[in-house]
Amino acid sequence: MIWDFVTSHFYIIATSLLCFSAWQLLLLYLLRWRGEGLAAKYVVWQNEAQAVETATHEARCASADEVADLPQGYPKISIVVPVSREAMELDELLPCVLEQDYAGWYEVVVANQGQEEQVSLLLERWTQRSARLRTTFVPATSRYIELRKLAITLGVKAARGEWVIVIGPTTVPSSSRWLQCYAENLTPDVDFVEGYVNYAPDGSGSGRRAIMERVRTLQSRLRAYEHGVVLGCELSNFALRRSWFMSVGGFAESLELPFGEEYIMACLHADAYRTAFLCAPDTRLTEILPSRSTLTARRVAEAECRRRLHGKQKWYWLAEAVVAWCPCLFLLSNTVYSALRIAMDCRTGVYAADWLAFDVVAGLWWLVALFVPLLMPRRSMKALQERHPGLYIWLYDLMLPWRMVYIDLLCRMQRRHFVRRYIPMTC
């Protein structure tokens, strides 16, 4: 009886399934595929802007002898590194940041969160080697502020530079020109800068997924940025004007959370018209891939931060959640249509030419769904110097919504722990 109903109403069923598949492809194009080339465009724009800024500074320096009061040089920069127990990683990072080929003045401020003995000894040794290195620490007193928030805040307050760049201890600059290229984008019309950071590939499935997540997050933020919206910030490789940080109250809005300080600050206070995105490899940081538990904790933290957003930022992330389901829904609808058509022809023993137009449309939808996800991100992945995921992108897209549900469940289960609490010094 069910089969008789399907065959008698197949025109309506087929039309509905193909229209539903087309709707999913349209959503994918509008909310994802159309913006996957933005990163490549931003790399080109950044390189052009850096070239102009370099030429401008060279002209200023060349005419400095004739015009004494002509502004010249690059801004003073303080690189703040919040560190807890990462002594080995910090030992690898410090020579990279202390030996930057920067034409201006800069310093490195290490904010010691936990006052670990190994970290303290390491900082003492490096302080004797380089006059650029300064240290500060979180005082051993009762406090209700998460350690990283307090460490970054103390580092910013201790900074003597006009600009502060926050980087993690497990990251490494792309080259000795990293700071110079970064500084060329710290212009007077900007208060907040987000640089690109991604994990070093290790060949594992979790690493490949984590790298793809950060690329997709960057693309989402660039799409929102094109419409005047700032969607959060990564944990590392962001720069802020020190006076701006003080004027907006720093991390005041995220004090009740044990994470999300830079994310919430960027969403609430960063003006898109005074914010810049740096995507070029020259200003990139490469981060050591953390453990799976750390990656999961970061995903849960980001999910909780997104839940607390409002206004346009909330709608953008809701759109991301909707489009995440489109590949699965498309696969379901087009597979159902194909299965029904095969079953109908198998029962009759001949191909029904009356459905040729429908079959051509279904085949076209399959081609679009299979090849467009492979082709669209090629330019951006090449510009970001990331390896193209290849066929893995199909698996990633199909698993993404289910992983989002899993992270949301973890977030709900752990939400009672997302409160400001007393932090003993033994942490």
Could you describe each region identified by the protein language model?
Residues 75-78, 107:
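Cell-envelope/extracellular polymer assembly enzymes that use nucleotide-activated donors
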Residues 192-217, 246, 252-317, 423:
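Catalytic donor/gating beta->alpha subdomain of glycosyltransferases that bind UDP-sugars
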